[in-house]
Every structure is written in C-alpha cells, then in structure tokens.
C-alpha cells in the first residue's frame, strides 16, 4: 500500500470512529425537529476534518482534495449527513483562490479553528436563476 492510500485509510478509520458517536437516533431526532446538527459539525471541526483543505499556514491540514473526498464519503457511508458540513469544507476554497492576503489571514484561521463557519454561497444559472432544482441541461 502506498503512503497516500495508508493516509487515506487512517483518515477513513478516524472519520468512522467519530461518526459512531452519532447514531441513527441522533439523525432521526434532528430530522423530526428540522434541526441543524451543530454537535456533529463541531465534532468534525474539532477533529480537524473540516479544515482538511486549508493550508497548514492558516491552521488547516493542507491535505489534497482526495483526502477531503474520503472524509465526505466516509461520513455518508457511516449513515451521517454530510450535507450539513460539506460547504464548510469546500466554500473556503473561494477565499483561498480569490481572496487577497489580508482576507486569507483574517478568515482562513478562523474557519480552520471553527470560530467562523462559512457555509453559504450564491448560485445563479441562466435558465433557473437561484432555483437550482429547476436547472435544465442536456448531455
């Protein structure tokens, strides 16, 4: 097994262990109450999983996209809901790619530590505006 595969196996195992603390009843209760899984997102943040893509210089792990994919895949595999946290992992990429040095220094360490949650982004499509469920496309 190569080093990258070993690292990803360790990540997968660690995510599975964390997810075991959030059984089906936790998710069913949140679903009934239409509530946000704050405890789950906090646990992922504190474990460093949601800052996987943030460079080390800003307090993240600086891992490759493949590691982030493994994290999200394992969350779903374990029966947890990655929808509540995937934006925290990926939206910061906009700041990383397009932010100036001051913005990166101001926001990325706070996102990495969990002090700031950046989980929103705007979408607009020519045929449906912001209603992505009405999007039409052809292959």
What kind of feature is each model-predicted range?
Residues 24-139:
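Glycine-rich flavin
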């Amino acid at each position: 097994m190569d080093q990258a595969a070993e690292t990803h196996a360790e990540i997968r195992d660690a995510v599975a262990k964390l997810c075991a603390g959030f059984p089906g009843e936790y998710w069913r209760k949140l679903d009934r109450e239409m509530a946000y899984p704050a405890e789950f997102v906090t646990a992922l943040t504190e474990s460093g999983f949601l800052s996987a893509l943030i460079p080390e210089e800003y307090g993240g792990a600086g891992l490759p996209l493949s590691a982030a994919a493994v994290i999200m895949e394992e969350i779903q595999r374990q029966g947890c809901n990655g929808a509540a946290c995937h934006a925290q992992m990926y939206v910061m990429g906009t700041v990383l790619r397009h932010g100036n040095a001051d913005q990166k220094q101001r926001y990325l360490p706070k996102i990495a530590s969990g002090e700031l949650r950046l989980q929103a982004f705007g979408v607009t499509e020519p045929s449906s505006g912001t209603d992505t469920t009405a999007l039409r496309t052809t292959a």
